[in-house]
Amino acid sequence: MTRDEARAKVIFALDVHEFSDVEQWADMLAPHVGMFKVGKQLFTSCGPAAVRMIQKCGGEVFLDLKYHDIPNTVAMASLEAARMGVKLFNLHALGGYEMMAKTVETLDKEFKGGERGKVLAVTILTSSNEQTLQDVGINIPVPEMVVKLALLARKAGIDGVVASPQEVPLIRKACGKDFLIVTPGVRPAFASSDDQKRIMTPAEAVRTGADYLVIGRPIAAAPKPVEAAEAIIDEIMAVEG
């Protein structure tokens, strides 16, 4: 694995809400990370302009809005995301087969087999555990539920999933090697676990076979963010040899 290939695995969670911060972080980190994750707070505050600014600075975008609605609404929102030129965007697998399949059908009709952003299905949020599922009436262990949702997403034609690193081996076994897996819940050894309950280090996550790692505060809160990003890349390369 080259350094560029290792860098491509790193998605920086751009958890800001001011447009000036978007420009600052994109300009600083575009050469040092593979992608920037734009979530609900930033997109609600700044809209598509945040995506365009990152792209202007040479960065790729993971639009993390987790669509979950009736099938046509999600399909149309996904189409607009793809038209923005983002590399990844997502929806909730819990929205069901019809919602996911309609989205893929709509994208395929628009892009006619051409290159487009990859659509991912969120399985179970990394802040969730067995008790969280039981509280909403799901009496299935987290790993089993994650695999169930991943298989449903694959059946619907979705390109991959967002899942905790602990479930990556199970998803790989169930869904195959050509199914993208993006994992949050990744924290270098020097960082705290924050609000995510199912976590791993970057080295551990890559070792399990994750394609992309979402990392935010360990880079953003570091005294020297560029050095923190490069240290994570070093760790990924060490794992791969």
Curated annotation (Swiss-Prot):
It is an enzyme of class 4 (lyase). The active site is at 66 (proton donor). InterPro entries: Aldolase_TIM, OMPdecase, OMPdecase_AS, OMPdecase_bac, OMPdeCOase_dom, RibuloseP-bd_barrel. One of its GO terms (cellular component) is cytosol. CDD domains: OMP_decarboxylase_like. Pathway: Pyrimidine metabolism; UMP biosynthesis via de novo pathway; UMP from orotate: step 2/2. GO terms for molecular function: orotidine-5'-phosphate decarboxylase activity. It catalyses: orotidine 5'-phosphate + H(+) = UMP + CO2. One of its GO terms (biological process) is 'de novo' UMP biosynthetic process. Substrate binds at residues 15, 37, 64-73, 126, 187, 196, 216-217. Gene3D superfamilies: Aldolase class I. SUPFAM superfamilies: Ribulose-phoshate binding barrel. Keywords: Decarboxylase, Lyase, Pyrimidine biosynthesis. It comes from the Bacteria. Homodimer. Catalyzes the decarboxylation of orotidine 5'-monophosphate (OMP) to uridine 5'-monophosphate (UMP). Belongs to the OMP decarboxylase family. Type 1 subfamily. This is Orotidine 5'-phosphate decarboxylase.
